Swiss-Prot record:
It is found in: Secreted. Belongs to the glycosyl hydrolase 7 (cellulase C) family. The lineage of its organism: Eukaryota, Fungi, Dikarya, Ascomycota, Pezizomycotina. It comes from Aspergillus clavatus (strain ATCC 1007 / CBS 513.65 / DSM 816 / NCTC 3887 / NRRL 1 / QM 1276 / 107). The gene is cbhB. Disulfide bonds join C511-C528, C522-C538. Its main location: secreted. Residues 503-539 form the CBM1 domain. Residues 1-26 form the signal peptide. It catalyses: Hydrolysis of (1->4)-beta-D-glucosidic linkages in cellulose and cellotetraose, releasing cellobiose from the non-reducing ends of the chains. This is Probable 1,4-beta-D-glucan cellobiohydrolase B.
Amino acid sequence: MLPSTISYRIYKNALFFAALFGAVQAQKVGTSKAEVHPSMAWQTCAADGTCTTKNGKVVIDANWRWVHDVKGYTNCYTGNTWNAELCPDNESCAENCALEGADYAATYGATTSGNALSLKFVTQSQQKNIGSRLYMMKDDNTYETFKLLNQEFTFDVDVSNLPCGLNGALYFVSMDADGGLSRYTGNEAGAKYGTGYCDSQCPRDLKFINGLANVEGWTPSSSDANAGNGGHGSCCAEMDIWEANSISTAYTPHPCDTPGQAMCNGDSCGGTYSSDRYGGTCDPDGCDFNSYRQGNKSFYGPGMTVDTKKKMTVVTQFLTNDGTATGTLSEIKRFYVQDGKVIANSESTWPNLGGNSLTNDFCKAQKTVFGDMDTFSKHGGMEGMGAALAEGMVLVMSLWDDHNSNMLWLDSNSPTTGTSTTPGVARGSCDISSGDPKDLEANHPDASVVYSNIKVGPIGSTFNSGGSNPGGSTTTTKPATSTTTTKATTTATTNTTGPTGTGVAQPWAQCGGIGYSGPTQCAAPYTCTKQNDYYSQCL
């Protein structure tokens, strides 16, 4: 997610054939262009490392689409202003406006190939498009929902072409699987057209929420000619797996008092879009792990331990207190695989703030050491985030720039008035003058990010199960019989049969616990470490 004003925009005119008009979230469906979802394969893995391909699809958020009069082709929204005749109020606007299909490659710079999705920053066709936000689909009318408790989520990413100020974000939100189609009678478009977005910032820049327009109370943005804030926002829990460019990265859980999507009113929404940031029902800050912010300035970046000049595999594990999918979320772990080596997440170097994973204790200590308000605990902490993961969340893949704070919260000093030696201020090596969207759009229009090779499965099942890019048919891949692993600066080559075989347990795989029947010996130099009675892991 996106902790600042989302800057996905389309520059529009009034010509029908351009098919690139105001970026809005419509609820009715037009007939000018058929909606065809690009295919994107992903995999589910079993405990033995065998993975099965799912034939998924992606859909672009409705906020990017052309929306026009249902009886013609007049824009409902142009620049950052509503058409007063078509949209005098929320209900009339929803009734009068229709949403069209998308030309993914030519208009939005979004292309797929096998299991890969490539997003381009600036796409110039008849008009100019900035960034994009897409969702994984189960079928043409339904978002895929992922339940990640006691699971790990793995994907490959190439951020080599993302400079300071850009954010290639892959994350989960508690959207309705049908995009709100069944809950809200005013919504006739649904997930097929990318409706129903929500996140922990309770965004108010959405043009339609819960089947109604957001025109009442709409204030055009003073910095973004194509955006504004309405009287309502759309709230839900958010799990940021990956927010990154080539300089910095962070992963961040954001719980809400109630995980699912709900509409909020005005400044009581809280978050980036409201005057009272902490006045809502969600945690806008979250509890983040950014290696640079935690004190290790040589871990992630060009030529560093995790080398952003190369594609990498990112593994995120969601551990529970009892080692089951019905347990309580207790820890979120991160590690990387690059050049055949497993790389442990960096350790925090600040006094009284040790560790390399997220737990309730770590998050409380971080808020104290960094002097931040502990809204993470206020809104449920790990337990609150776990409630959302248990219900199932929708996968979001995006690329954006930041009109609110130039992405300095990710890759530079924030606040800019702070001293870089003060704990928590420095988040990356980018200059505080970097990240201006106008500069990025002018000087880095060809910036891009590629997400690929998505896998989900039991702990230890996904990161050593091959890196194929399958086509449309269902296939399976088995883990390699050998792997080169790295823990800190030590490298070892070991043979393994996978976590439930009779040989040696893989690095970071399960190696013990109640009900576990796999190998209990870890590959050197790893040690089987008890996490709880139900789960031990090779660390």
